[in-house]
C-alpha cells in the first residue's frame, strides 16, 4: 500500500506488530512504514504526517552524502573486517576461499568470476566470521543480563544491524556487523536482547541498555 505524506510517497507494509515504525532508507531516502495489521489507514497517515518535517531532514542528509564507491572485489581495494582495514588480493584457483594474513585478505576466486560472484563469496565469509564471534559473545550477554533468546540467526541486512521477534524470542544479526568493530556487535546483541523485555525504544529500554553498557552511545555512533 502507498500513501502520500505531504507530497512524499511512502510504502506501507502490514506486519504482526503493535506499534508503527517509520524508516527512511538509504541511499535515496525512500520511506517505508511498518504498521499493525488492523490499524486504519487514516491513523497511519496521521502518524506519517506528524513526521513529515523529520522525514525531509533525513532525506536531505542522505542525498547530500557522497555516494560510496561500489567495491569491485579486485586486487588493491580496501575491505573492512571487524573495524580493521585490509588490502584485498584476488587470485584465481579451483576452490573459492578467503584467507586473512597480516594486513592482507586473499580471495581465491574461480577463473573469469564476476563481481557478483566475488561479492557473494565475501558475504558468506563475513557471515562465517559473524557466526563465530556472535556464538561466543551472545551467551556471555545472555548470562550477564538474564535475558535468553530461543534462537538467533544471521541475515545480510543492509538497513538494520539487528532485529528481534520478542514473541518467538528470535534474534537476527546483520552480516554487515562483521565489518564493524567488535564493540558494535556487543552493542547490537545487548540492544536486541533488551527487546525481549522492553519492546519499544522508550526510557525504560535505554536505561536497561545503559545498565550493562554505559558507553552505548559511542558504540552506536560507530554504526552510523
Whereabouts are the PLM-identified features?
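Walker B catalytic acidic pair
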Residues: 192
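Active-site-proximal or metal-binding-adjacent scaffold patches in catalytic folds
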Residues: 1-187, 196-224
Amino acid at each position: 500500500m502507498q500513501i502520500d505524506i505531504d507530497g512524499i510517497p511512502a510504502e506501507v507494509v502490514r506486519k504482526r506488530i503493535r506499534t508503527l515504525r517509520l524508516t527512511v532508507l538509504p541511499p535515496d531516502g525512500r520511506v517505508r512504514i511498518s504498521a499493525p495489521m488492523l490499524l486504519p489507514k487514516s491513523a497511519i497517515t496521521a502518524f506519517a504526517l506528524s513526521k513529515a518535517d523529520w522525514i525531509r531532514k533525513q532525506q536531505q542528509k542522505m542525498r547530500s552524502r557522497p555516494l560510496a564507491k561500489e567495491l569491485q572485489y579486485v586486487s588493491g581495494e580496501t575491505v573492512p573486517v571487524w573495524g580493521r582495514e585490509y588490502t584485498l588480493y584476488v587470485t584465481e584457483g579451483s576452490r573459492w576461499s578467503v584467507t586473512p594474513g597480516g594486513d592482507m585478505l586473499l580471495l581465491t576466486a574461480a577463473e573469469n568470476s564476476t563481481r557478483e560472484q566475488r561479492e557473494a563469496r565475501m558475504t558468506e565469509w563475513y557471515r562465517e566470521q559473524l557466526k563465530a564471534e556472535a556464538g561466543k559473545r551472545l551467551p556471555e550477554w545472555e548470562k550477564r543480563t538474564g535475558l535468553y533468546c530461543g534462537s538467533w540467526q544471521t541475515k545480510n541486512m543492509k538497513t538494520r544491524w539487528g532485529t528481534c521477534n520478542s514473541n518467538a524470542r528470535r534474534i537476527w544479526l546483520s552480516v554487515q556487523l562483521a565489518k564493524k568493530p567488535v564493540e558494535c556487535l556487543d552493542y547490537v546483541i545487548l540492544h536486541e536482547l533488551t527487546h525481549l523485555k522492553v519492546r519499544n525504544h522508550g526510557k525504560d529500554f535505554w536505561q536497561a541498555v545503559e545498565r550493562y553498557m554505559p558507553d552505548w552511545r559511542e558504540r552506536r555512533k560507530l554504526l552510523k
